[in-house]
Curated annotation (Swiss-Prot):
Catalytic activity: 2 D-sedoheptulose 7-phosphate = D-glycero-alpha-D-manno-heptose 7-phosphate + D-glycero-beta-D-manno-heptose 7-phosphate
Gene (UniProt): gmhA
UniProt protein name: Phosphoheptose isomerase
Residues the record lists as binding Zn(2+): 58, 62, 169, 177
Enzyme Commission (EC) number: 5.3.1.28
Amino acid sequence: MNEEIMTQLRSHREVMEAVERELTPRIAAFAGMLVAALKGGKKLLVMGNGGSAADAQHFAAEIVGRFKMERRGLPAVALTTDTSILTAIGNDYGFDAVFRRQVEALADEGDVVVGLSTSGSSRNVYDALALANDRGCITVGLLGRDGGTLKDIVDLDVTVPSGDTPRIQEGHITIIHIVCDLVEKGLFK
């Protein structure tokens, strides 16, 4: 058992080192985009499926509530949280529309719309990001593996260099925490 634990921790370290080496400029760009949008009165919309849905909620919670700094709340919505909206859209339009329909209702030009997908190929995230692009939003993909189909349609892809879903998710939450920290410092320090 100890060997397996050490193997997983080693794998985690290797992915975090790759994130640092390969993604630092992209993480900085992501934070800069979000700071500029929030300064301009825009909002964050964020989405994902499964574990990525939980990460989307976590991201929105840190932005609306606070990360580390005592400050005013900032506008962010996780499109994964309202079961009535999700099931109404899913029932009437299908699962592929659950995020697209919310983007249609909530996204304004200049908002930052973030899609999380460990595969980079979630159809419902793709459709929502495509519509967000059409509406003049800034689109960001927190992705994994090779970035999948989402990599080609977002303004900025931040693709964790791993093919292992748990390591990708760990990369995503680390990136989210870094972005939240940079947003607070960029807006309130």
